[in-house]
Amino acid sequence: MRHIKVNVKGQVQGVGFRYFTQQAATENAIVGWVRNEDDGSVLIEAQGEDKNVDAFLNEVEKGPTKFARVQDMEVKELAEDTELTKFEVKY
């Protein structure tokens, strides 16, 4: 099991990034959340099986459309959180 926090920087707001991230999480059996940050980045907390988290990160790095552009992804490893049960978009 892998639990991470990811700060995604680039053109990632106003391009459907959060909903794309939620879809990628669902497809890869990931629980956690995603939200826009005031600095223009997107913050993601994600937890799942190691291979699923890797696949999820690959999808997130590609982005939802040609209008989205991921310039940097800072990944921080966290301790497992047993209270995460679904993936949601936070506001």
Swiss-Prot record:
Record-linked InterPro entries: Acylphosphatase, Acylphosphatase-like_dom, Acylphosphatase-like_dom_sf, Acylphosphatase_CS
Enzyme class: hydrolase
MF GO annotations: acylphosphatase activity
Cytoplasm keyword on record: no
Gene3D superfamilies: 3.30.70.100
Superkingdom of source: Bacteria
GN (gene name): acyP
Keyword line: Hydrolase
Protein name: Acylphosphatase
Source organism per UniProt: Oceanobacillus iheyensis (strain DSM 14371 / CIP 107618 / JCM 11309 / KCTC 3954 / HTE831)
Domain Acylphosphatase-like positions: 3-91
Catalytic reactions on record: an acyl phosphate + H2O = a carboxylate + phosphate + H(+)
EC number in record: 3.6.1.7
Active site residues according to the UniProt entry: R18, N36
A UniProt-annotated Pfam family: Acylphosphatase
Protein family: Belongs to the acylphosphatase family.
Keyword Protein transport: no
